[in-house]
Amino acid sequence: MGQTITTPLSLTLEHWRDVQCIASNQSVDVKRRRWVTFCSVEWPSFDVGWPLDGTFNLDIILQVKSKVFCPGPHGHPDQVPYIVTWEALAYHPPPWVKPFVSPKPFPLSTLPFSPPGPSAHPPSRSDLYTALIPSIKTKPPKSRVLPTNGGPLIDLLTENPPNLGEQGPPLPKGPVKKRRPPPPRYSPPGPMVSRLRGNRDPPAADSTTSRAFPLRLGGNGQLQYWPFSSSDLYNWKNNNPSFSEDPGKLTALIESVLTTHQPTWDDCQQLLGTLLTGEEKQRVLLEARKAVRGNDGRPTQLPNEVNSAFPLERPDWDYTTPEGRNHLVLYRQLLLAGLQNAGRSPTNLAKVKGITQGPSESPSAFLERLKEAYRRYTPYDPEDPGQETNVSMSFIWQSAPDIGRKLERLEDLKSKTLGDLVREAEKIFNKRETPEEREERIRRETEEKEERRRAEDEQREKERDRRRHREMSKFLATVVTGQRQDRQGGERRRPQLDKDQCAYCKEKGHWAKDCPKKPRGPRGPRPQTSLLTLGD
């Protein structure tokens, strides 16, 4: 009552600081949340027997590792640090892991034969490690069929089968004593150019689990060669763009191969010859030799120092010695620097200006594309503080129109850092209307526009009707007035006169003022009009 079951996953979480230290010793970094996700969700889906609570079984760990390291689109590079740390916990278990780790099988030749003893007592229910203690059942003794004369046994893994036509000596009569067969012999591979790995113990003879991981290590404690498989090289070449098309992606692939496989000098040449063209390879090697630094830490052009650090001919580096491994580490670092420098195209600012933010692209993703364009098409490093102003201006001008306009109107824009601009752009981007909201707004604006147009049409029609009504009213008024005048006789119009016709006598030759028939006497006084008064 009250006890909790301890599992490998919960145990690692309880000792998380130790796990991080072990990961740091492996030159990797692990996160707690992703550790739990990979252990309980991702790796059980590989169908190699990984339990949801984790395990320290090396066979299962190695099969998961083979899935993680699978080249091409089926691999999981993001899970490499985590499975490598699990493997380190199983190979070199700390004290808190040892109770969960099954003891390594001893060589069969050193195990003395003993008859099966009585069954051990069953574990109690309160034991926290009951899952790790195998149940031992009493088995009936088997018939002994092997001879007791110490005759040689044939190792079917290393020896040829006997001739069926020959018959061996007759078996002696009497009780037969059982003997164990000798352990299988593991012949180390030949000196083939390939990856470097430390040796591990050979698999147990009774193990039926197949290890899909291609790197098997001997038990002599020496580093051995294991070649790149042709399928690996084929997948790497066909599943990735060429170096000229996308140098960044191919450089990232080669960097992961250099980190995880630790290739030798010959391996690197094979890798470059497969993934690069001849011209690309020469450019990479030239840039790598330029990156060699002297004792003062500055780039050097001394042939002896350059050839010592990055030789073009096959060196005699012994990978089994610390000095040889240090040479290989430096060579791989210089090769990676050469890939990065050779991947830069000639300066082309037009390519940088052509990088614009997509309609649904986040500002962070757009900034990464912009920085990649700076690295690829310019000699400038976008992470350099001296180039922050140029990158910021490009970020503002080449952002989406709505984001760029609002960024330009920010107060105190000169004091804003690139990080501040990205945060402001993220706020603007997150406040954008959704496609549904945009469709609704467009529909609403269209309806309002149609309503305004309809109202304007109605207003124009009413104005046209009023104007037509006024004109019709004037016309009708004129017609009615003319008809009324016709009924009343109308006004008598004066007859038309000629230019020299008198208006008084109607004779021609003089005007009315000179008409002799017109009386000339003074006019009589007009009679005064009498006004009525109050007295009248």
UniProtKB/Swiss-Prot annotation:
Keywords in alphabetical order: Capsid protein, Coiled coil, Host cell membrane, Host membrane, Lipoprotein, Membrane, Metal-binding, Myristate, Phosphoprotein, RNA-binding, Viral matrix protein, Viral nucleoprotein, Virion, Zinc, Zinc-finger
GO cellular component, one term: host cell plasma membrane
SMART domains: ZnF_C2HC
SUPFAM superfamilies listed in its UniProt record: Retroviral matrix proteins (SSF47836), Retrovirus capsid protein, N-terminal core domain (SSF47943), Retrovirus zinc finger-like domains (SSF57756)
Pfam families: Gag_MA (PF01140), Gag_p12 (PF01141), Gag_p30 (PF02093), zf-CCHC (PF00098)
Lipidation residue positions, type N-myristoyl glycine: G2
Region (Disordered): 139-216, 432-536
One GO BP: virion assembly
Sequence ranges of Basic and acidic residues compositional bias: 432-464, 484-517
Keyword Zinc assigned: yes
InterPro entries reported in the protein's UniProt record: G_retro_matrix (IPR000840), G_retro_matrix_sf (IPR036946), Gag_p12 (IPR002079), Gag_P30 (IPR003036), Retrov_capsid_N (IPR008919), Retroviral_Gag-Pol_poly (IPR050462), Retrovr_matrix (IPR010999), Znf_CCHC (IPR001878)
ZnF bounds (CCHC-type): 500-517
Domain of life according to the entry: Viruses
Site (Cleavage): Y129, T130, F213, P214, L476, A477
Coiled-coil intervals, chain numbering: 436-474
Motif extent (PPXY motif): 183-186
GO MF entries: RNA binding; structural constituent of virion; zinc ion binding
Full protein name: Gag polyprotein
